[in-house]
Amino acid sequence: MEEQVANAIEIASNPSSEPALKAQAFDFVNQLRSDPSGWQVCLSLFTQTPQRSGIVRHVALEVVNGAAQGGLIDLQALAFVKDGLLAYLRQVYGQDAGASDPPNIQNKIAQTVTFLFSALYANGWETFFDDLLSLTYKSPSSTARDNASGIIFYLRVINSIHDEIGDVLVSRSRNEQDKANSLKDLIRQRDMQQITSSWQQILSEWRDGNDVIVEMCLKAVGSWVSWIDIGLVVNQTMLDLLFQQLGRAQKADLRQGEEKVRDAAVDVFTEIIGKKMKAEDKIDMIIFLNLDTIVSQLSNSPPLHANRFTFKYDTDLAETVAKLVNITVIDIVRALEQEGVSAECKEKANGLLQVFLPHILRFFSDEYDEVCSTVIPCVSDLLTYLRKIAKINPALAAQHSSILLPILKAIIAKMRYDDTSSWGDEDDQTDEAEFQELRKRLGVLQQIVASVNEQLYMEAVSEVVGTTFENLRQSGAQLDWRDLDLALHEMFLFGDLAVKAGSLYTKGSPNNQAAERLIEMMLRMVESDIRSFTHPATQLQYMEICVRYSSFFHHHTHLIPGVLESFLQLVHHPVKKVKTRSWYLFQRLVKQLRQYIGNVAQTVVEALGDLLVIQAEVSPEGSDGDEMSSEDHEGSADAVFNSQLYLFEAVGIICSTPTVPADKQVLYAQSVLNPIFLDMEKNLEAAKSHDERALLQIHHDIMALGTLARGFSDWMPGTNTPATLPAPEVSEAFNQVSEATLVALESLKTSFNVRTAARFAFSRLIGVLGSRILPQLPRWIDGLLTQTSSRDEMALFLRLLDQVIFGFKGEIYSILDTLLTPFLQRVFSGIADPTTGTDDEIRLAELKREYLNFLLAVLNNDLGAVIISERNQPIFETVISTIEHFSKDIDDFTTAKMAFSVLSKMGSSWGGPDIAPDATNGVPPQAALPGFSQFMISRFSPLCWALPTTPSFNSKDAQARQVLAEAGGLQRTIYSKTGMEYIAYLRDRELPGMGMGGELIEEFLGALSRLDLKGFRQFFPSFIQRLSA
């Protein structure tokens, strides 16, 4: 059997094995894993002499591990496994050991031994640590732990045990954690003394002899210290041994592997300080360990001092020491801010804070960002503490300036690009992203400093910015771009303090002192020769700042022409990232400065002409946008076109400023429109033949037309914006845009992309054309709502129509009357189509709600007559039946509630004048639709009971109660229109037919006739809840 298992493992692991035979071998080994007796063969295979091959032994032990952890081995059998493995360990690692196992086998054995420890240490293997420690001697007579292979295995198991029961980062169930805690208690009772004694002996005897042993031992001390008596580690014997290992940091040249020992020794101190204890005890511990001296010595050691700013600088050690500084300062600050800590302790902590401030600054200002990042948590805690103190007592803010100022200067210095860094190189994208993330974290720290001492922050930033612009004035392009970028970045962040409600000004005056400072900076920036500074990073920053602080130009309009000139140069930037971003920023700038720009349209249109050429690029087949990096996406054809659209909007904004005469607006608009019209005409035939590039070109052309229209007018029907419709001649010019889009849509309405672009253009053209667009509405609907239109498309278009109805309610009746039936038939078709999957169900629910919103828009804007006109009479029953269906949908309460709202509005609109008081809140009576009062009673009233009588209806559900309230509102509306006729119907037919008793009927009818609309809406849900109880 053993040979069979060994052969199967060899075949399964051999790449050159015949596939069918290999598959059989895999199956055999997998069956072995689940066989209750398979582990016995594998244990024998592993411990055999002479040894089997490495792969056989590895897999065999894996099977034993799997069986033990899977519960296939009972306690008695585990004892057998323990005896077998212990004999093996003594033979291979003990006093007569030859060559030990390779690391992968050692790790696998350590894993097995750790499991056996968990299962048997409490009961069955009480001598666990004695047995392992016996491996550390070469002979029973040895007085020193002199067996290297045995010590390494012992430490391997020690570290594995910590991972199993002591590592707080490992997720455990409640039972697992309880077991881990009881095992730790047992170790502390039985063996902790001898374990820590063994560490001291190993560190003493092997301190210079074997770096692997020393490193493993230090890791064991560092990991176990978190859950053992601190006195077992923090004692003079152990500390002397740790200090000896720290001494390696003073060596100029370390042998290979020695730096790991040194770093592990520092980590032990970090773990000691990280141990949970009272604030007073922690402060005393920091003082007792003399950590200030330790950190000072390490900071001044050759790897961190003499080698700093050279290629020999030891970043690993710097990061390791930074962790020690970070955890120490966090505990110092915790002692300072905790309530209940004695005054004496706080005084000690304050002293330590002053002592550690140079250490914080040393590592916070380290040129390597990973080192700086390591101490950011403690800097954040310290600044947050200072902010808390300053809030309680503002006078203390000035006292803390000796701490704040050097930290702030370090923050600002770290925000500067490194001298070795470049900008925009594709190879440096990861570094750039990491640096920007660091800048964000530093920005948060800077905000805290500003909140502690605003004046200090303003002075520091003003000095950096002022000095940089002065250097720029004197040396021009010789200035390092990194310095200018830093000054501009600080200006951008400064707005967090200076800008209120999007502006630097309130009633024409600067918001505050920070705004005054920023206005001075803006003047210096715009008036300096920054435009001649050609580095892309600073050019981008310049544009971002101009846009962010555009309110500055409202009060310095004489500077606008120069800034516009700069932007017009930068929109042609050779670096794609800068160029495409500048298109967006240009649009933002001109939109915010629209009323101040003046008549520069001709200049702008001519300057941008070459950038307004549209060239669609079809994505290569198989390219997957999801797998594209953000940088790649920014440069993709789609992303570039989306950015290009901002230029079209910017042109529209500039050409329609108040200073440009209407005839000139038309002229400039046509200079942009005509090339697009020609392009659409050129590509239409190819697009009709489903040419992918031609279809995409027409999509892009229509999107550009719609975007240009948006630039010309912000006006939207029914909104309260101050914008107005453009001059009639401008609207007439854009009528051509509508016609050109419709021609393309009518020819290409099967294309989703073309429909999407056309819907976009339609929504933008409304603002330029106003009511001129209404006669074309049937054509728009015919093109946008086709047999292939998705529910999403229908819902989006319904939303647009709501706006059109609201804006043009006085002019739309006849058109709406003509198109309502065919339009609703398409919507009904979309609602009736079967759904496939959750996403489809969500889209269906959205379409239902937009359909109901559309009906409400029609009714609320006094256009309800169109639904019951002679032309639309045939579809009226379908309209009502869909609403009835929605009102009974127990799976969609939102739609059901809306359905009742529509029915109530119909009752108010067509039910005639009120004959019962207080129902429609003063709405003037309308002429009754003949027979509608009876229709409401027979069709609408029963719906109010349909949902609550559904078996699965829960009357306590919050959404269900909202639906019932709306249903109660409908009942009150019916009563207000029909009075006693409705009361009689309810008393004689509807309520008895539901099995309701006389007392309940009278209670219900009394409430209906007595309560107003609001009162009955509250009554009905409670009434239903009582009936359901």
Swiss-Prot record:
Source species, domain of life: Eukaryota
GO CC annotation, single: cytoplasm
Keywords from the UniProt entry: Cytoplasm, Nucleus, RNA-binding, Transport, tRNA processing, tRNA-binding
Gene Ontology BP term (one): tRNA re-export from nucleus
Cited Pfam families: Exportin-T (PF19282), Xpo1 (PF08389)
Locations listed in the record: Nucleus; Cytoplasm
Keyword Nucleus: yes
InterPro entries from the UniProt entry: ARM-like (IPR011989), ARM-type_fold (IPR016024), Exportin-1/Importin-b-like (IPR013598), Exportin-T_C (IPR045546), XPOT (IPR040017)
GO molecular function: small GTPase binding; tRNA binding
Transmembrane spans: none
Family: Belongs to the exportin family.
Function: tRNA nucleus export receptor which facilitates tRNA translocation across the nuclear pore complex. Involved in pre-tRNA splicing, probably by affecting the interaction of pre-tRNA with splicing endonuclease.
Record-given protein name: Exportin-T
Organism: Aspergillus clavatus (strain ATCC 1007 / CBS 513.65 / DSM 816 / NCTC 3887 / NRRL 1 / QM 1276 / 107)
